[in-house]
Amino acid sequence: LHTGTIPSKSLRETVMHLALLRQQTHGIEFNFKENITTQELMYRKDIVIQDQENSLRRNFEKNGITVIEGTPRFQSTSILEITPADQSEIFEITADYFIVATGSSPRRPSWVPFDNECVFDSDTILNIKHLPKKVTIIGAGLIGCEYASIFSKMGIRVNLIARDRNVLPFVDRQIAENLMYQMRNQRVTLRLGENVENIEKV
């Protein structure tokens, strides 16, 4: 809930609404950086996440589902040991079948100097403290293109870099070409067919 689809879609919807508001001001200048803070943008994201979490917990309780917060470790194919988040007594769960559904996490290459100040992954960017004047996004898959659209709608200069010569190489070419056209109209600079060799903070 706290990373991935829900927070990014919440942020995207907020930005899209604000972009629509800007279009409806009939020529009156509306600047994201002057009229809305990063904290205000993130506030709505956090509200949506909390609402979704509360809704899930209510549904779990209604359907007799027990939620255990802790660190699991398999002792055997039928025994799962859990260390509770509050570090209280460890206990075990036995079952005939276990389903492991931990979700995915961003790829973090060892050569990238992630610091959560200037260099972020697709999860930590959701906790950004201020809106930058420009941003470079590495990767033109679904997540990279989504964030390129979000930041460009805020009026932020975006460079989108990818090794492939097309965005979303796994979708129909007509769809990808239309997306590239739309992103260029939003002043996203597409640097396709290029490799990033190093990242340095200056």
Where are these regions (language model features)?
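Rossmann-like NAD(P)H-binding beta-loop-alpha module
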Residues: 129-163, 168-171
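Glycine-rich flavin
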Residues: 1-131, 164-168, 174-175, 182-186, ...
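Alpha-helical segments flanking ligand/cofactor-binding loops in enzyme cores
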Residues: 149, 180-181
